[in-house]
């Protein structure tokens, strides 16, 4: 962290990207500025964002590989230059981009002699390879070579116990960390009581997302982390005691949305992202394509607006309401539905 004195003026708090570049397919760089901040705030924001960027961003990677008739991971396979362990290490380095949730299957099936690269991986439609030239193995003889793979979206470093699997399946220590490094520096500006701070934030990613996307996701995760403090229950009110006392009548979807919009005082709806609502991937993608990112965005739409969204169905309409009933606090629903 660096501190310097620079000239500056007090303005409304704002941020912008001052530098962005692509060093390689697997190395993106971005530099951002946030100002003006009061003394001490830059450290607070910088530390929080750095930790969130390095530990809270989700990434997609290969978590398991299954070979046929391989006794252990240190085995060699006839006609292949690399050992099984070396192939597993190469698969661990493959950088993937996706918005999938849960485990997905992929595979490699080729005939030698030839080099196997990431381009040879057969992936589900929702997953793409960042660098198709990443090496996997070298087949030196005319053999058929197949691997079954598992792909998962997660965060952080996931370690599995090493053991031999009789079916030839081996876990891969997954590194779901799209952000490779984060630095921040603080610059002081102004004089006397008018002194403020400017925060510079540098982000390097592996290409599965841009530094700007990583900054957005880290900020959203921090907002999600603090939201419970904004919705603290009133003293003497127990959610467990009241959660089963309210059953909404069979309103039409439009009436429900209208009533939800009536009173926004109890909760900052623009701070509730649709990611938090656990919508199905289909419904979520429909809303995202329509630039609906928060609960406030959703409640600003009429039923007709939603039905005009490409691929949006009547079933999605019902699913949205059922999800709102499930996730919004009971006292909030009482206020907003005003029965």
Curated annotation (Swiss-Prot):
HAMAP family on file: RNApol_bact_RpoA
Keyword Transcription belongs to the record: yes
Function statement: DNA-dependent RNA polymerase catalyzes the transcription of DNA into RNA using the four ribonucleoside triphosphates as substrates.
An example molecular function term from Gene Ontology annotations: protein dimerization activity
Name listed for the protein in its UniProt record: DNA-directed RNA polymerase subunit alpha
Lineage: Eukaryota, Viridiplantae, Streptophyta, Embryophyta, Tracheophyta
Subunit details: In plastids the minimal PEP RNA polymerase catalytic core is composed of four subunits: alpha, beta, beta', and beta''. When a (nuclear-encoded) sigma factor is associated with the core the holoenzyme is formed, which can initiate transcription.
Natural source organism: Thinopyrum bessarabicum
Region (Alpha C-terminal domain (alpha-CTD)): 264-339
């Amino acid at each position: 962290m660096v501190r310097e004195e620079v000239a500056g003026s007090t303005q409304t708090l704002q941020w912008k990207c001052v530098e962005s570049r692509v060093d390689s397919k697997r190395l993106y760089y971005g530099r951002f500025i946030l100002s003006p901040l009061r003394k001490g705030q830059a450290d607070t924001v910088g530390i929080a964002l750095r930790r969130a960027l390095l530990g809270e961003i989700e990434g997609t990677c290969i978590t398991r590989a299954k070979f046929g008739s391989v006794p252990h991971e240190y085995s060699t396979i006839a006609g292949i230059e690399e050992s099984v362990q070396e192939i597993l290490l190469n698969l661990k380095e493959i950088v993937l981009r996706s918005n999938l949730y849960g485990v997905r299957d992929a595979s490699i099936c080729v005939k030698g002699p030839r080099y196997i690269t990431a381009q040879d991986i057969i992936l589900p439609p929702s997953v793409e390879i960042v660098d198709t030239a990443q090496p996997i193995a070298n087949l030196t003889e005319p053999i058929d070579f197949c691997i079954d793979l598992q792909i998962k979206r997660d965060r952080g470093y996931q370690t599995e116990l090493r053991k031999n699997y009789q079916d030839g399946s081996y876990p891969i220590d997954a590194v779901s960390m799209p952000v490779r490094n984060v630095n921040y520096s603080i610059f002081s500006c102004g004089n006397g009581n008018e002194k403020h701070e400017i925060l510079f934030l540098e982000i390097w990613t592996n290409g599965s997302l841009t530094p700007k996307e990583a900054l957005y996701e880290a900020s959203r995760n921090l907002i999600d982390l603090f939201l419970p403090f904004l919705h603290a229950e009133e003293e003497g009110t127990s959610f467990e005691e009241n959660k089963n006392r309210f059953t909404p009548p069979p309103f039409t979807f439009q009436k429900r949305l209208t009533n939800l919009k009536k009173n926004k005082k109890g909760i900052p709806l623009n701070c509730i992202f649709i990611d938090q609502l656990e919508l199905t991937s289909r419904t979520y993608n429909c809303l995202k394509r329509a630039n609906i990112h928060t609960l406030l965005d959703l409640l600003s739409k009429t039923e007709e607006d939603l039905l005009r969204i490409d691929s949006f169905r009547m079933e999605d309409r019902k699913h949205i309401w059922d999800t709102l009933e499930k996730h919004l606090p009971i006292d909030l629903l009482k206020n907003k539905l005003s029965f």
